[in-house]
């Protein structure tokens, strides 16, 4: 048995927006009973979604799958305005689990468009957060995913241009794209503060701190989790083999051959119980000690919708 050491990234796992979104579903189930409909996976984590489904949540992709008169929850990623309008038209009871930091971007987009600006959204095509943000306005918004896309944007007036970003991007990739936009459109304006959220930034920074100290990195998170995929990429860009695993069963023993120090982190939608199970699995595979690295403390919390708050 080799004597491996596990290093735990700090911070890792749940962020305030994810905790709030899960709590909204759980409180709605407690108040109103099953079924509670949720448009899209409330957060991108299989374990969390399966757990809520077992409690009576029904996950749908479109509102026409929600029967009239029922309760629907919008996922943490946010929704286009058309979805809100449809829910209102149909008289559905709505609880909005959109992360407040995503809502902030929605408000920025609406304000920029009202000012007569066209908008460039930096993000991943097809991601629900991007669809929700771009769906805040009827027109005048362009998506860029890679630097090459910047050359292909056609705008009416380069003097009247603004940008926003998806909240879960790679911090470094986003900076590269912003630089490319500024080079082509010197007058482009952006939000006062970067749209990439505190949790995305902190978790990427924690991996940057951990990666030089380990021989392999495991990121606990689901394949469809944008921020979890970015954590894996951050480690790989620093030259460390990195694997995205949904749970302990996803670990292949061969990945640990000749590895003395094993780094573990978790995406913002992955619960600590999965990290604990990964640590136990690594102990079975030869790890004998666990150490949590120092990191930035997080004290952010977001309140629930008033109707779901429990009295103190």
Curated annotation (Swiss-Prot):
A single BP term in Gene Ontology: terpenoid biosynthetic process
Biological role stated in the UniProt entry: Catalyzes the conversion of 1-hydroxy-2-methyl-2-(E)-butenyl 4-diphosphate (HMBPP) into a mixture of isopentenyl diphosphate (IPP) and dimethylallyl diphosphate (DMAPP). Acts in the terminal step of the DOXP/MEP pathway for isoprenoid precursor biosynthesis.
Keyword list, A-Z: 4Fe-4S, Iron, Iron-sulfur, Isoprene biosynthesis, Metal-binding, Oxidoreductase
Binding site for isopentenyl diphosphate: 44, 77, 127, 225-227, 269
Residues given in the record as (2E)-4-hydroxy-3-methylbut-2-enyl diphosphate binding sites: 44, 77, 127, 167, 225-227, 269
Residue numbers annotated as active site: 129 (proton donor)
Class of the enzyme per the UniProt entry, highest EC level: oxidoreductase
Known catalytic reactions: isopentenyl diphosphate + 2 oxidized [2Fe-2S]-[ferredoxin] + H2O = (2E)-4-hydroxy-3-methylbut-2-enyl diphosphate + 2 reduced [2Fe-2S]-[ferredoxin] + 2 H(+); dimethylallyl diphosphate + 2 oxidized [2Fe-2S]-[ferredoxin] + H2O = (2E)-4-hydroxy-3-methylbut-2-enyl diphosphate + 2 reduced [2Fe-2S]-[ferredoxin] + 2 H(+)
Residues binding dimethylallyl diphosphate: 44, 77, 127, 225-227, 269
Membrane spanning stretches: none
Recorded metabolic or biological pathway in which this protein acts: Isoprenoid biosynthesis; dimethylallyl diphosphate biosynthesis; dimethylallyl diphosphate from (2E)-4-hydroxy-3-methylbutenyl diphosphate: step 1/1; Isoprenoid biosynthesis; isopentenyl diphosphate biosynthesis via DXP pathway; isopentenyl diphosphate from 1-deoxy-D-xylulose 5-phosphate: step 6/6
Any Pfam family the entry gives: LYTB
Cofactor(s) named in the record: [4Fe-4S] cluster
The keyword Zinc is assigned to this record: no
GO molecular function, one term: metal ion binding
HAMAP family: IspH (MF_00191)
Record protein name field: 4-hydroxy-3-methylbut-2-enyl diphosphate reductase
Lineage, opening ranks: Bacteria, Pseudomonadati, Pseudomonadota, Betaproteobacteria, Rhodocyclales
EC number: 1.17.7.4
Superkingdom assignment: Bacteria
Assigned protein family: Belongs to the IspH family.
Disulfide bonds: none
Residues involved in [4Fe-4S] cluster binding: 15, 99, 197
């Amino acid at each position: 048995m080799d004597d491996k050491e596990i290093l735990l990234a700090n911070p890792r796992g749940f962020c305030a927006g994810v905790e709030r979104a899960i709590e909204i579903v759980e409180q709605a189930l407690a108040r109103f009973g099953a079924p509670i409909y949720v448009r899209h996976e409330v957060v991108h984590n299989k374990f969390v979604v399966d757990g809520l489904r077992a409690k009576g949540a029904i996950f749908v992709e479109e509102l026409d799958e929600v029967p009239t008169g029922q309760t629907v929850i919008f996922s943490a990623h946010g929704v286009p305005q058309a979805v809100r309008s449809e829910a209102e038209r149909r008289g559905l009871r709505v609880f909005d689990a959109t992360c407040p930091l995503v809502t902030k971007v929605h408000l920025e987009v609406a304000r920029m468009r009202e000012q007569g600006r066209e908008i460039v959204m930096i993000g991943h095509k097809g991601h629900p957060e991007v669809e929700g943000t771009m769906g805040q306005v009827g027109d005048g918004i362009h998506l860029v995913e890679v630097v090459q896309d910047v050359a292909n944007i056609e705008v009416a007036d380069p003097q009247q241009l603004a940008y926003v970003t998806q909240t879960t991007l790679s911090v470094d990739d986003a900076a590269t794209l912003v630089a490319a936009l500024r080079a082509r459109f010197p007058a482009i304006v952006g939000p006062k503060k970067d749209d990439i959220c505190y949790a995305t930034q902190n978790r990427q920074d924690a991996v940057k701190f951990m990666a030089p100290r380990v021989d392999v990195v495991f990121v606990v998170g689901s394949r469809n989790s944008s921020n979890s995929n970015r954590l894996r990429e951050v480690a790989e860009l620093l030259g460390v083999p990195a694997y995205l695993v949904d749970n302990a069963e996803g670990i292949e023993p061969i990945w640990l051959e000749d590895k003395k120090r094993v780094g573990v982190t978790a995406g913002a939608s992955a619960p600590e119980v999965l990290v604990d199970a990964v640590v136990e699995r690594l102990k079975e595979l030869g790890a004998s000690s666990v150490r949590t690295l120092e990191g930035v403390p997080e004290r952010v919390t977001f309140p629930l919708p008033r109707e779901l708050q429990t009295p103190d």
